[in-house]
């Protein structure tokens, strides 16, 4: 099936990518409870922004699926990790061996290792699903800072 047909099929089912559809179907098959794009996480760049993670597992783990892992996505996730260190955000890549950009030596996997993110390829590993719960997330997670703005 062509990439355009895969994406069209995913959109028809309410997802943004073929990988998201594939993961949701796998979770549905094993009757695993999850939420799709159900929370928003506020983070600060030059302005306040919100991030909507792809999947929130019943144990509180946040799953972000990525076919392409662009510079702006990497920057965003580093900022979110710094601003919300209590969140357990993990990646499921289409291919974690893919290079960060053309001519780069580092791959998506190496970036995750360097910055302390857990990752896997194409599926959510069973041990992630079986991990004991961390916490439930509110529908909106606000950015909070202790620094005084002037």
Task: Give a label for each model feature.
Residues 1-150:
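Nucleic-acid endo/exonuclease domains
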